[in-house]
Amino acid sequence: MDATANPKAGQLTIVGSGIASINHMTLQAVACIETADVVCYVVADGATEAFIRKKNENCIDLYPLYSETKERTDTYIQMAEFMLNHVRAGKNVVGVFYGHPGVFVCPTHRAIYIARNEGYRAVMLPGLSAEDCLYADLGIDPSTVGCITYEATDMLVYNRPLNSSSHLVLYQVGIVGKADFKFAYDPKENHHFGKLIDRLELEYGPDHTVVHYIAPIFPTEEPVMERFTIGQLKLKENSDKIATISTFYLPPKAPSAKVSLNREFLRSLNIADSRDPMTPFPWNPTAAPYGEREKKVILELESHVPPPGYRPLKKNSGLAQALEKLSLDTRALAAWKTDRKAYADSVSGLTDDERDALASGKHAQLSGALKEGGVPMNHAQLTFFFIISNL
């Protein structure tokens, strides 16, 4: 059922609180929390919990639904149903879950699926995950050679394929094979950890690097970024360092015989096919940051002028202010969705092309009206050139 077609009175919005306490909350998430009838949350720290309660007094902590006497999957069913019951009562419900609310989170997907099928409006807004933090702290770009992400137990149970020519990120390496819940896990209880290491050794060998990563939560903390070889993780003194919130990152093997250029395809794109496959700089000691090509283009900066196709942002744009309001005020956004033209007509300080763009809501018109010249812009070109630049 289309959740946007004549939805019932209740609605569900799922947002993420991110990993870092308070700092990762998006402006959009905060706006949703402030205007909700009921806020249900499962967050990882007390400071974020206090921040949420400060923004809305009608808050319910779903964490007490966990129990050491039942499986986590049972708790997830209950969490989803708890939120759905408030939606069915006609309330505007916001669910806040730590990290990205759709990454390794079960109750959020379940609640949204059921709500939509029952005719309620239900949406999920993105948040920062542990993997996003990992990319930033370790300097990893997943687009360079691709990235595979697995939950550790799932990878072992289903014998998921590994590709040593790409990045590998493994979640929940500290609770391999655990389906139960405990408020405090002991690293010594990670009895199946050795099976994970055996699988990695089979693919990568004992000397390949593994980065043990934990993203910081409080502003007083620093990220954990410990480097081991796969063989070293067989030692108890190292395996005991792995916590429930630990993530593993394995860099690709370089060079890899599994990677080869599709030169015929490159020629069809009029791209030179003489370059070797690119490997991430931190893991390729032969990659020179200031080679001949880099030096040449850096020198060209001195004489660079903006190209004819570049269009600067309009000064004192009324449309920019209107879009800021729609981004931060959920009630204003609801009014725009109810009657786009009427809302656009009610906004003062807009030019004709800005008003038309606001009423249309289309990306090309909005982007064009925000820039000098007012010509619609197509963002697809930017995506294409970004992809090609990574070859």
Curated annotation (Swiss-Prot):
The modification N-methylphenylalanine is found at residues 385-386. The active site is at 72, 76, 98. Homodimer. Residues 254-373 are annotated as: Clasp domain. Residues 374-376 are annotated as: Precursor leader. Within the homodimer, the clasp domain wraps around the adjacent subunit to position the core peptide into the other subunit's active site for iterative intermolecular methylation. GO terms for molecular function: methyltransferase activity. The keyword Transferase applies. Residues 1-253 are annotated as: Methyltransferase domain. The modification N-methylisoleucine is found at residues 387-388. Its EC number is 2.1.1.-. Gene3D superfamilies: Cobalt-precorrin-4 Transmethylase, Domain 1. It comes from Coprinopsis marcescibilis. GO terms for biological process: methylation. Pfam families: TP_methylase. The gene is cmaMA. CmaMA automethylates at Leu-382, Phe-385, Phe-386, Ile-387 and Ile-388 before being processed by the prolyloligopeptidase ledP which likely forms a peptidyl ester upon removal of the follower propeptide, which then undergoes macrocyclization with the N-terminus of the modified core peptide. Peptide backbone alpha-N-methylations change the physicochemical properties of amide bonds to provide structural constraints and other favorable characteristics including biological membrane permeability to peptides. Fusion protein of the methyltransferase cmaM and a type I borosin core peptide; part of the gene cluster that mediates the biosynthesis of a type I borosin, a highly methylated cyclic peptide with potent biological activities. Type I borosins derive from the C-terminus of the fusion protein, and it is the same protein that methylates its own C-terminus using S-adenosyl methionine (SAM). The C-terminus is subsequently cleaved off and macrocyclized by a prolyloligopeptidase to give the final product. The modification N-methylleucine is found at residue 382. Transmembrane segments: none annotated. S-adenosyl-L-methionine binds at residues 98, 100, 103, 130, 172, 215, 246-247. In the N-terminal section; belongs to the precorrin methyltransferase family. The keyword S-adenosyl-L-methionine applies. This is Methyltransferase/ribosomally synthesized type I borosin cyclic peptide precursor cmaMA. Keywords: Methylation, Methyltransferase, S-adenosyl-L-methionine, Transferase. InterPro entries: 4pyrrol_Mease, 4pyrrol_Methylase_sf, 4pyrrole_Mease_sub1.
